[in-house]
Design a protein with these regions (language model features):
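A donor-sugar binding/catalytic signature common to diverse glycosyltransferases
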Residues: 171-194, 343-388
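A nucleotide-sugar donor-handling region in carbohydrate enzymes
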Residues: 82-89, 187, 203, 207-289, ...
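C-terminal alpha-helical cap of glycosyltransferases
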Residues: 442-462
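Basic, ligand-binding patches in group-transfer machinery
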Residues: 1-102
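Active-site and donor-binding regions of nucleotide-sugar-utilizing enzymes
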Residues: 10-12, 25-27, 31-34, 39-46, ...
Length: 462
């Protein structure tokens, strides 16, 4: 139930996606404001659909809500009633309205520098009338920086944090991990800013979250989530195409004359999960035997990579995924490779790099936003989407990507030299992908996000 828009969500499961619903309030037929059909499949076969209908309950409605499917009245509610009392619905959900209009924003508990930080800064500078706080652990390297800037900081997990999050009207975060979600109750609206562009199918993970609204950056991403017959439960009521808050800063800080390449692969569940519950020595040995470690360690120590970078005067920066940081000492990093400073802004790292080497990570979209080339090193593409924590989505790296896809070191170095010779300028076929991918590149993403958040609590206007 959305008490602000006075809309109620009606859901049911069916094997027939062509059902005709008739929803009646006080014996009058009303029509859904939003509809979504979610498919559930098993072994490549659809076994049922979920229909999700958001229906407006007008202020004049006083009696009962009934639902008919194919002209047959169905039971609704927890106890199998054939109708629900409108007054009771309103009464129950009015109790859940928040106690204040304070907004709590955060990125990770131990790290800022993501969409929530950038949105907070925009609100602080442009809408001081809105009461906001930013949650972070005090030991975070970002705490002092944000404190000096004037952020109203509260320590994540503290008594003050728990007091404020209970009364907050909105919790706004770039992450939706359990350490934060366990604090979310029906009283708050949880706003998901996302950490990166959703390019793969993470519906199983996202569908388990209580998300009132989330923001996306590309049209393909938007369509892959809201369209009927996807695995996502979210539709046009919950998903808004605005661009990411941090992208405004990317545009402002773009550098193009720094000869630096960044190597930034994602992690592998197969290299990490299989070492849980092991002692530290066994854990390290198993990681070092993984294909993931051997391939990336080999590339970092490749003598031809060293020669190319010396010949064309490029520096190399290695930025491991946070899940790989415990194993960083296992990499035999040569003297010419720098480890990215963990205290340095990730946004500035993108801005100060000319080229990225990654595998499947959505960080490639950040470079694409800056119109900088990417090389995808996918030595395990035949098994990655089977053994990792997600399913392949709409994004085709060969067709939709922002640079060449390679499967071995030699091919990677050939593509790298080609880009070095071209002064790291993007080749035309990838340039068109970069130009067509993002819905907005106007520096107004924060403005659109804030306007959407304000609209959330405005009374029904449809």
């Amino acid at each position: 139930y959305d008490p602000y828009k006075e809309q109620i969500l009606i859901t049911y499961y069916t094997r027939d996606d062509k059902n005709i619903e008739s929803i009646r309030i006080d014996n009058e037929v009303i029509y859904a404001d939003y509809e979504k059909i979610v498919k559930y499949d098993f072994l490549d076969r659809v076994f049922c659909y979920q229909k999700r209908l958001w229906v407006h309950v007008s202020k004049d409605a006083k009696d009962k809500l009934e639902v008919f499917i194919n002209n047959k009245q169905i039971m609704i509610g927890k106890y199998g009633e054939y109708f629900l009392d409108i007054k009771n619905i309103r009464k129950e959900f009015q109790k859940r309205l928040p106690k204040s209009n304070i907004w709590l924003l955060m990125d990770r508990d131990y790290e800022a520098d993501d969409n929530a930080e950038h949105l907070y800064r925009y609100i602080m500078q442009n809408h001081p009338e809105q009461e906001i706080v930013f949650a972070l652990r005090k030991e975070s390297s970002d705490w002092e920086r944000l404190e000096k800037e004037g952020f109203n900081l509260i320590e994540f997990g503290s008594f003050e944090f728990e007091r404020i999050i209970k009364k907050a009207s909105k919790v706004i975060s770039s992450h939706s991990d359990e350490y934060l979600m366990r604090y979310i109750t029906p009283r708050q609206q949880f706003i998901f800013l996302q950490h990166g562009v959703t390019q793969n199918d993470v519906s199983k993970w996202l569908n388990s979250k209580k998300i009132n609204l989330f923001f996306v950056a590309t049209q393909m991403e938007f369509d892959s989530i809201i369209k009927n017959y996807t695995r996502y439960k979210f539709g046009q009521k919950e998903v808004i195409l605005t661009g990411f808050a941090r992208h405004d800063a990317l545009l402002r800080n773009k550098q193009s004359d720094i000869k630096q390449i960044i190597i930034m692969p994602t992690w592998r569940a197969s290299a990490i999960n299989n070492v849980f519950n092991s002692n530290e020595r066994n854990m390290k040995e198993k990681f070092k035997r993984s294909e993931y470690f051997q391939k990336w360690n080999s590339l970092l120590n490749n003598n031809n990579l060293k020669k190319l970078c010396e010949q064309y005067s490029y520096t190399v920066v290695f930025k491991p995924h946070p899940n790989i940081m415990p194993y960083l000492k296992d990499f035999n990093l040569p003297f010419y490779t720098k480890i990215a400073n963990q205290d340095e802004s990730l946004q500035m790292l993108f801005c100060n790099s000319s080229l990225m080497i990654t595998d499947y990570s959505s960080v490639a979209f950040e470079m694409a936003y800056l119109k900088k080339p990417v090389i995808y090193y996918q030595f395990d593409k035949d098994v990655f989407f089977i053994s990792h924590t997600l399913q392949k989505g709409y994004f085709d790296y060969q067709k939709d990507g922002f640079g060449p896809v390679v499967q071995d070191e030699d091919s990677l170095l050939i593509k790298l030299e080609s880009l070095f010779r071209n002064n790291c300028k993007v080749f035309n076929n990838y340039k068109s992908n970069m130009e067509s991918t993002f819905a907005f590149k106007d520096g107004k993403c924060c403005q659109r996000i804030y306007a959407t958040l304000i609209q959330l609590n405005i009374k029904y206007l449809m």
